[in-house]
Structures are given as C-alpha cells and as structure tokens.
Regions:
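Non-catalytic helical/linker scaffolds that mediate oligomerization, partner binding
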Residues: 1-507
Length: 507
C-alpha cells in the first residue's frame, strides 16, 4: 500500500494547470531536476532532436528516482525528431542573404566553397518545389522564392533578407512534401523507448491521421504502452484537425513551426481552435513554444509573455510547456516558478465570482470554436487515454454534486485513468485525487488538469476505497470532520461493478 503520509501532496495549494519542462544542458542534472519538481513541473520532455541515448537514459533514471523519493507521479514525454528539414553545411557556417540575391538549392554540393550553393537534409526537396513557391529559412526570418527548377536543383531569389547558418530549419508552407512522418532515426529512438519506457511519445509534423496510425503500429510492434501526442505544426494538420484529435491520445499546439507554416497573425485563433477541439474530444492539450522565451536570459518575463501564459490557461489548455527556458536557459527553476504563479492567477480568475457570473459561463461544451455543443461519443471499446460516454456522464454528475455540496475533495478510483481524464475536463474547483493500481497510468495522469495521482497496489471494493481515502486524507490534513468527499469509481478489470458515484461525510 502507498505510504499513509506524503508531505509533497498539496492539492489545495498546487496549480491545476500542468507544467511541462524540456530538459537539456541547463537542467538535466539531478539537483536541478529536483528543484524543478519542487517548483511545479509535472511532465518532463526529452527532446530527441538533441542529446544521445545514453544521456536520455541517465536523465530518465534520475527522473524516476526523484519521483519515488518525492512521492510525485512524474510523466515523461519523448519528443521524436521527425522529418525536420534543415540546411546542410554552409562554407563559413553563415551567409548573408541580401534582397534580390540568388541561391541554388541542390541535393548535393558541387565542387568549391560558394556559400550561395545550399544543400539540405531532405534530398528530394527540390523535386517537391514549384516555381513561385516561397521557401522559408531560420524560423521564417529569411524567405526566398523559387524562380527556376530542374532535376535535383532549384534556383531561389531572396524576398526577405537576413542571415542563415548551417543546419537551420527550412519550411515550405505551400508544398505537399512526400517526406514520411517517421524517419529512420525515429524508429531507432523507439527501440530505445521499448527498453526504457515513457508515458508519452510526441509525433512531430503530423499532417494526417495515417501518420498517427503508423506510429501506433510501431509502438504496438515494440509492445510500448505510451500514449501518442500529436504535434500540430503544419497547415495540413490544422485542416485535418478533428480527425487527428480523434485518433491521438493528446495534442500539442507547437507554435514554433506552426507560426512559420501559417501567418503568425492566425496562430492565436488556431491555438484556441485546437484547444476547443481537444476539449470536445476529451483529450489533454499542451500549449507550447516561446511562452516565457525572454527568461532564457532574464530572471523575469515580459508582460506580453505573462499574458500569453495567462490567456492560454483561460483558453482551457491542460498544460503549458517550457522549451529553451528550461533546456538551455540561465533561469530554468525561476521559469517554472513564474509559470506556476501566472497559471495560479489565471485559475483564480477562472473560479472567481466575476468569471462565474460572466455572460457565458466556463464549460468544455460551450467553448468558442468547439464546432457545436456537446462532444462526440467515443467507441464502447476505447484506448487507455479515451473517455467512455458512460464515464463522462458519471463524472459530469459528480462535478455537479461537488459544486452543490461544496465538497472538500473528489476521489476517483480508476485503473486506466479514463475516469480521471474525464473528471479533469469538467474543470472542478474541487481538488481531485486519483487512485490507480497501474503505475504507468498514475504517471500519465501528470498531464491531466487538476488531477493528483496516487499509485496503490490494488483497487479495492468501493467501501475499502472509501475507508482508504478517508484515512489517507486525514493523515495529510486534507479533510476534517463535517467535510464532504465525493467518490467516483471507474471501470475496474475483472470487477462486475461499473462506474459508481457516492458522497461521504467525514465523521
């Protein structure tokens, strides 16, 4: 049985919005990892575009150890590199791109050291280009138009001047590239996953449902139980959003490449659309990229960054993510603490009298851009991360009971975590404690808004769950005599009981 006391469990004090932190040279050492957890990190992102397998293995081992020592169920997100198209080596490493200057992009460099000869990692890119298309470099800071092309080459003319360096990114927003969603490197990285285990695998540059299906086949082939996070960063993914969300287990609003692939003025609206669609489908959504970007080199964020995090929480994101701020920044711990503080302020407004008495009240089914009220029913047989319709109905009733009775705590007994996920989408003001006998499910709940998970060796009968939760919460000073606790029991394997709801008054 889990320890009866756990000083790290603070459901009444911790922010409900989950925080994802990307690890790198500035943060992967055990001492900093521990400080990040104390500051509020719930999910650690391992970026497989950088670092070796040995480095990732050591980092993962440190995360697991800290999780055990702190009593926190920490989720790990493995972010696959995907088919990111980059420049090859440039003679001198950097070249100025003056307005009107011409460059040749080819699969292979000809003899000589002319910096106006460019190569890229995707050898058939030039075959996918058309005359008149715009090619973007270095996150869109440099643009060139295709003025001529032939087998294996394309002539480009600079329309947006700037500077490019070796290995910087290339984007072609209007091109339908034939590159596969999973690269050979990704498959090797999945072999690592099969040996070590993570809770989430991020798929980069998703364009269509088939990309997710392919990854799921590779996970199944390797017997990997990880949930799939579809990263929305291509215009094709936005066009196929509802189908992608229906197949994925979670979604990331990857605003970096998304802001290059579509006009930056559209990004806020698309962000709201993605979040609303994920709520409709009852899956977690992460808002990512440049949220506190200035904190890579400053101990305080800009006012605009604070507003960005605040409004993402009000939009309904389940999690907010830090990238360079924690991976390579000078203030990784301060970045997490700042993000937590901003999220707390947003949640205070979310549950304030002002917000509740607004012209329209907060509701996952009443969110602007959700394409209609209600949500799509999921199949009667669902994946681990999917919410069943009957489960959704029970937790909706439980949320209403919590509000009516001003409950002190909502306890969810679940095996797969579906019931806890459904509860998180209700956005309860009541703290939620999830009990599960599945360690991987407990860790995965690190991404679920407002849910604090505990791993226990077995799920008991409803009466035993009640007694266990009562004793545990008393030992941690979470409830007192006269408090009401609402208990929801999900579907338990090999148990004839279905979803159940009861109210317990603490004696």
């Amino acid at each position: 049985m889990a320890a009866m006391t756990n000083s790290s469990f603070e459901p009444l004090g911790r922010v409900r919005t989950k925080i994802v932190a990307t690890l790198g040279p500035a943060s992967r050492d055990p001492a900093t990892l521990r400080k990040l957890v104390e500051a509020g990190v719930d999910v650690f992102r391992l970026n497989f575009s950088h670092a070796s397998h040995d480095e990732h293995s050591a980092t993962l081992q440190a995360i697991r150890k800290i999780g055990e020592e702190s009593g926190r169920q920490l989720a790990v997100l493995q972010d696959l590199c995907g088919p990111k198209i980059r420049l090859g080596d440039i003679p001198g490493d950097v070249v100025e791109c003056d307005f009107g200057a011409e460059f040749c992009l080819a699969a292979e460099r000809k003899e000589g050291d002319d910096p106006h000869q460019l190569t890229c990692t995707y050898k058939t890119l030039t075959d996918d280009l058309e005359i008149g298309q715009s090619v973007l470099f270095a996150d869109g800071t440099v643009a060139m138009d295709v003025i001529d092309r032939g087998p294996g080459w394309a002539h480009l003319k600079v329309t947006l001047p700037g500077r490019i360096r070796s290995h910087q990114g290339i984007n072609v927003p209007s091109a339908a590239l034939s590159v596969a969603a999973l690269t050979d490197k990704d498959l090797v990285d999945l072999d690592w996953t099969a040996q070590h285990g993570v809770e989430y695998v991020g798929l980069s540059f998703v364009r269509q449902v088939e990309d997710i299906t392919r990854l799921r086949e590779e996970l199944d082939r390797r017997k990997i139980r990880a949930r799939i996070v579809a990263k929305i960063e291509k215009p094709q993914a936005v066009a196929n959003l509802e189908a992608i969300v229906a197949e994925a287990d979670a979604v990331m609003v990857a605003r970096g490449d998304l802001g290059v692939e579509i006009d930056v003025s559209r990004v806020p609206a698309v962000q709201k659309q993605i979040i609303a669609t994920c709520h409709k489908a009852r899956i977690p959504v992460i808002t990512a990229t440049q949220m506190l970007n200035s904190m890579e080199s400053s101990s305080r964020p800009t006012r605009a960054e604070a507003s960005d995090v605040f409004n993402a929480v009000l939009d309904g994101t389940d999690a907010v993510m830090l990238s360079g701020e924690t991976a390579i920044g000078q203030y990784p711990v301060e970045s997490v603490a700042t993000m937590s503080q901003i999220a707390r302020e947003a949640e205070n407004l979310m549950f304030s009298e002002f917000r509740l008495n607004a012209p329209w009240t907060w509701s996952v089914d009443n969110w602007p851009g959700a394409n209609g009220r209600g949500h799509q029913a999921t199949p009667s047989v669902a994946r681990a991360g999917q919410v069943l319709p009957v489960t959704d109905a029970v937790v909706e009733a439980a949320s209403a009971v919590c509000r009516r009775l001003n409950a002190a705590l909502l306890v969810v007994a679940t095996h797969s975590g579906r019931t806890a996920l459904a509860s998180s989408k209700q956005r309860n003001a009541t703290p939620t404690l999830a009990l599960t006998d599945d360690l991987e499910a407990a860790r995965a709940m690190g991404l679920y808004w407002g849910v604090t998970a505990l791993h226990i060796p077995e799920l008991f009968e409803t009466g035993q769950v009640l007694a266990w939760a009562d004793d545990w919460c008393r030992a941690n000073d979470l409830i007192a005599s006269g408090d009401r606790v609402v208990i929801v029991r999900g579907v338990i394997p090999n148990n004839p009981n279905h979803n159940a709801l009861l109210v317990h008054e603490v004696e």
